[in-house]
Amino acid sequence: MVHSLNKLYIAMKRIYLLFTIISAILVTSCSEEAVFSSSPDYRLEFSSDTISFDTLFTTVGSPTATFVVRNRNSKSLRISSVQLSGGEKSPFNILVDGQYGSYMHDLEVRSKDSIYVLASVCLERNSSDSPVAVRDTLMFNLESGLQQAVILEAHGIDVVFMRGVNIENDTILPAGRYLVYDSLAVSSGATLGISSGTTLYFHDKAFMRVDGTLNAQGTVDSPILFRGDRTDNMFSYLPYDRIPGQWDGIVISSSSSNNVLRHCDIHSANYGIRVDKGVADDERILIESSKLHNFHGNALELSMARAVVVNSLLANSQGNCVKVCGGDVRFIHCTIANFYVWKVRDVALSLHNSIEGEPAPLENALFANCIIAGSKDDEVMGYNTAFADSVDCAFNYRFENSFINTPDVADTNFVNVVYDRPDSDFFGKLNFRTIDNEIFLYDFHIAAECAARGVASGYYLDVAPFDVDGNPRPATAADAGCYNFVEIKEE
């Protein structure tokens, strides 16, 4: 019993000694941290002296920006106040070390320590056709009398909000900016016209469904843009607009026909345009001088459709840039190129004569004056399904005067074709002006050394007399693809 009490006494004594040492250390540390300076020579350091918000939609709150206020000095500093120069009328919202508002006071930044500032903004409508700049200053007033400032700036644009809109009568959208939440639908029997120069911003998971007819007529100088609504950056070098999956995509349903898209740019969605199986004899869609690029799924999927695609770019998809499942399709002067690197991907072009195991006769698939390229050794795949019960399901295709990344084959359906030979070092990148997989920047104008130059036939000149940029094509020896080669002039 006595022995146990002695052990308990010794243990308690050790605990008391340890507590005394820790208390002394804490008191010493607190005493050192509590030494504040009122000298104007001691300054704060900001991780950024200007906080810039990318172009924002008015009345819609911005993402939150964060910056750090550091005290690298040997003594602590007191901040008498932090305030927005615009006061309570400022559109900017500030949170400083847990305090929220346009005016905050009695803040401390200990020596060798830091605090965080969170900033956001919600801009009022400005009734301007161009982005309107808004600026304010966040003032830090130190106990010493020293003033330091961080600039806050943003640019706001007005948009027309469309939330779950269903177009039931013939409608023309005037040129402008539209922000789509949930969906934009066109009912059967109705036609939606979209004026040149229009931009449709789609929120996350928002989509467009056409049961009637879509008539989107842009121009070279005023294209129609379909894109996501994120205008900020993931990283300093990477806008969200270059990242696939920002919105859902466009569905042309089975009841829809006579759709026309000219000079449209559709990008960075889960899929581009999906044309569902419809009435066999209907002209389902004409795509001309347009760009579909950067998708999680397929850029263009055609199921038992009569479709014509002219002078267009279809690029960079985790699925296929073009997937054709039966029907009658013609591609003239198109660039179909896949350099998608976000995940393991499929080939640029795939042809099928079945849909979910059922026959889907491929009556005709013509690719004339086209480029089919990418980083794989073979970017063209055909799936000619053999059906039971002696079902003869058509699988007809033809490639003419085109530049194709596929092995040289003894096939009479390949006429005047030049075969690409991607090397192991550059993987087909040298065919185009810019293929930058580091910052996900792509320019599919053909390079001077690209073997697609002079490959095209003049037979289709009346179909595509100008390239997608509006440059006239020569009557003979034009280039394959949607871009005719133009020498870059050095300034």
Give residue spans per PLM region.
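Beta-strand/loop edge motif enriched in small/polar residues
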Residues: 31-36, 44-55, 60-62, 103-442, ...
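Short, solvent-exposed loop/linker segments at beta-strand-coil boundaries, enriched for Pro/Gly
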Residues: 85-103
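Asparagine-centered strand-capping/turn motif at beta-strand->loop junctions
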Residues: 69-73
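Positively charged n-region of N-terminal signal peptides that target proteins for export
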Residues: 2-7, 12-15
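Short acidic/proline- and small/hydrophobic-mixed sequence motifs that coincide with surface turns
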Residues: 62-63, 74-79
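C-terminal motif of bacterial Sec signal peptides marking the signal peptidase cleavage site
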Residues: 26-29
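Sec-dependent signal peptide hydrophobic core
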Residues: 16-23
